[in-house]
Amino acid sequence: MAIVLDGSSLTIEKLVRIARHDEKVELDPAALERIRVCRAMLEEKLKAHEIMYGTNTGIGEFSEVVLDDEQVKLFQRYLIYNHAAGIGDPASQESVRAAMASRINVHAHGNSGCRPEITRTLVNLLNKGVTPVVAQKGSVGACGDLAPMAQVALLMMGEGEAWYGGERMPARQAMTRAGIPVPGLEARDGLATINGANLLTAMSALQLFDINRWLMQMEIACAMSLEALVANMKPYDVRLHRLRGFPGAIRSAGAIMKCMQGSDLQTGKMKTKVQDAYSMRSSPQVIGAAHDAVAFAWQQIETELNGVGDNPIFIPEARLTLTGANFQGSPVSLPMDMVGAAVTMVSVLSERRLNRLTNPALSVGLPAFLTKGAGMFSGLMLSQYTADSLIVEQRILSTPASIQSIPAAADQEDFVSMGMNTAMKNAQILDNGYGVLGIEFMAAAQALDFRTFTAGKGVRAAHTVIRKHVRHLDEDRPLYPDHDAMKSLVRSCEILEAVEKEVGPLDTPN
C-alpha cells in the first residue's frame, strides 16, 4: 500500500521506507484540492498585478524589482538556472528521494502556490524511480537548500541529469523512458520547488533513524564489555535511573540489563568490585543523554517534515500572502549539531571501555591486549590506535555548523543556518562511529573467549554473530580486514536483530 502524503502524517520511519525501500507514495486527494485552491488564488492575484515576492518580483537583493507579465513567464526558468550552482559529488539517491518526499508534503498543505502538475511530477519521479542528480555541496541552509533543490527543479523543464534503472543520464531521457511528462515552469513553480530546507532535513532524518539503531548496538557492546570486565551490576538497575528521571538513561539501563539476562553477573554468582570506573558505571547516563538528544531532534525533524517550509506562503481562505523565513534551517541544524556531538561523546565512552579491555592493569585478569602470546604477539594493541584516530576526526567534526553563518546576497541573507554542513559532517561522524563500535565489539568478543562464566542471553547472541564474521585472534594477523568487517556488521544491524530476537526490543522498558 502506498504511503499517503497529506502534509501532516509523515514520520521518519515512513521517510526511510520511501527513500531506501522504494515504497510508492500517493498525494492525498484533499491535499490535491488544497493545492488547486491555492493556485487559483495566486493566478487571480497575478491578474490583478498584486506584488508577490518571487512570483512577480526578483529575489533576495532584487526583491524590489517588479517583473512585467512577460518576465513573470520566463523568470522561473532563469531562477532555477541561477540557483543550480552546487559543486562536487552528488548526494546519495536515498537522500534526494527523501528530500522530494518532504517537498511533496510541504505542497500538500496548499500554501505554496505551485501548479498541481509540479507536485504530481515529484510523485511520479519517486514512484517510477527517476532520481535527480544533485550536487551535495552548495547550500547554506537558508533560503532552504536552494542549490541542491534547484537541480531537482531542473527536471520540471526536462533538464539536468537523473538516475534511472541504475544509470546516470540526461533528465529528459530518463523521464521519457519512465513515461513522465515534463510539466514546465510557470509563475511561482520554480521557487515553490526549491525554497525549503528539504535536503538537509531529509539527510538528518535518515541519520537519526540510523543513529537510534547505532545507540542500541552501543548498549549491546557495553553489555559485552561489562561481562568481560566482571562489572558490578548495581549501576544498571533501572530503579536507580527512574529516581533521577531522564528517559534516555532509564531506557539505556533497561537495554543493558536485557542483554545480560541469565548472566552469572546478574545472578550474583561472581565477586565484583564495590564500584567500577566511570566508563563502565556511567554508561546508561551517557548513552541515555544521547538518546535524549536524538529524541529532541526527532521531534524537531518530524515537525519540519510536516510543516510549511516555504516563502512566501499563501493563505487562500484569507486571500493573504505572507513573506517570512520558514525556509530557515536552524530548527533542524541546531539539534542535529547536538546529535553529532552526542555520537562523538558515546564513541569516546566506547573507546574508554576498549582501553579497559586491553590494558592489563585494568582488565580484571584478561591477558594484555587480549593475546596469550604477549611479547611475540601484540594482539589488539593497534585496534585502539585506529579507534583513537577515528575519534579525533569525530571531535573535529563536532564543532557546530549552526554558529558558522556567513552573510551573503549583498547582506540581504545575512544569517544562514549552514544546516547542510551539519548534515554532511554528521554523516562522517556516524561513519566513524560504526568503526569505533565495531572495534569494541571485536575486543569484547575476544575478551569473552577468555572468560569461563555464563554470559547473558543477549551477549551470547551478539558473540555468535560476531564470530560468523571475525574469528578469534590466536596469533597476530593483519587486522584491517577484521576492522572493515566489523564496521560493515555494525552498519547492517545484524547484531541488533539477533539480540532482539533473543531478548526482545531494546527500546522498550523491562
Can you say where each PLM-predicted feature lies in the sequence?
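FAD-binding core of FAD-dependent oxidoreductases
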Residues: 53-75, 83-105, 135-157, 173, ...
